[in-house]
Amino acid sequence: MKEIIAIIRPSKMAQTKTVLEGLGFPAMTANRVLGRGKQKAIVGELGFEVDNKELLNQPGDMRYIPKTMLTLIVPDEDASLVVEAIMKVNKSGQYGDGKIFVCPIEDIITVRTSERGEAAI
């Protein structure tokens, strides 16, 4: 099993979710996060409400900007399909398109049923 963590533009969340659901991957966690890459932050790119003072009062000229972090667990054989789908929706060729991390998962346990492994996805 693989954990896929995608940091994307908030404005791409709905489309990404729709595509993943259409491929049979409706289970995911989405978090609002602040971050930046190597480039200077694109301060005008706001996909959800954030206090401008929070952005403008940061020291230095490298500001954190809002992003959405999606996390989902998929069987090993589906990881490439999910990564490609996320890339297709989110790749514009511009700074700020995001990052995708693919990590191994040792086990999953559903608390309610005690199911383990892929049955718990």
Curated annotation (Swiss-Prot):
Membrane-traversing stretches: none
Gene3D superfamilies xrefs: 3.30.70.120
SMART domains listed in its UniProt record: P-II (SM00938)
Gene Ontology MF: a single term: ATP binding
One Gene Ontology term from the biological process aspect of the record: regulation of nitrogen utilization
Keyword terms: Nitrogen fixation, Transcription, Transcription regulation
PROSITE patterns, A to Z: PII_GLNB_CTER (PS00638), PII_GLNB_DOM (PS51343)
KW Transcription (keyword) present: yes
Keyword Cell wall biogenesis/degradation on entry: no
Coiled-coil ranges (or none): none
Cellular component terms (Gene Ontology): cytosol
Family the entry assigns: Belongs to the P(II) protein family.
Function: Could be involved in the regulation of nitrogen fixation.
Protein name per the record: Nitrogen fixation nifHD region glnB-like protein 2
